[in-house]
């Protein structure tokens, strides 16, 4: 089990069954340009390599300025990662970009620099990790045990005069708008997945991270979604990438966690209930781009 699989079940239990029980695969689509998943991987890796290279790991505004003032370094890094992730080269990663990869490189460099400008606003912060994978062979939720795995995009600790706090960061290069009216919305398939998926993921990340790491039981942990497409507007308007439930910014996942874990426990019980069939979603909007729509017979 993983956060993405749990979100699939919320979207449509039948899709979850076809994909993760029967093991049916989605057809890979041919695209003329870079697909969103590959673009997201490139952005993730760019940010990871930059922050992994930092020494010390306390990131000051001056640290970020040194990167922003060295555009050639960021361009070179983009070339290497595009050649690896998009062109699938195993060697000669410094090969000059040609054709559509030139445009991809310009877009990647632009967005990485914009994200760094945003990070400069929250500096100083202690960079802790990127692409942190963790798993458990028998995670007990309610009365059910299951294998679980997650990968957190980034973890850092903002150093503030008002008190330090940990951030669990998820980069999103799609159209996610993580803002729901209530915790119930996170488990409601009639609510647009773009509004609930990222926050559901982050709440699970926070829970499992605290269980997996000693010393964070009482520490403030803030879930954050870096919406890459929105970074320009965020910088211009002075906004943040914080997420909201109702009208309230989620500054600590614990403020909502008792209710969240209660609903999550109910969901897991439903998923493992042998008397509960895997039914179609009630929200036909979830079917529009489903690869299994012909199998289930839903008329979209």
Q: What are the roles of these predicted feature ranges?
A:
Residues 1-300:
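RecB-family 4Fe-4S metal-dependent nuclease core
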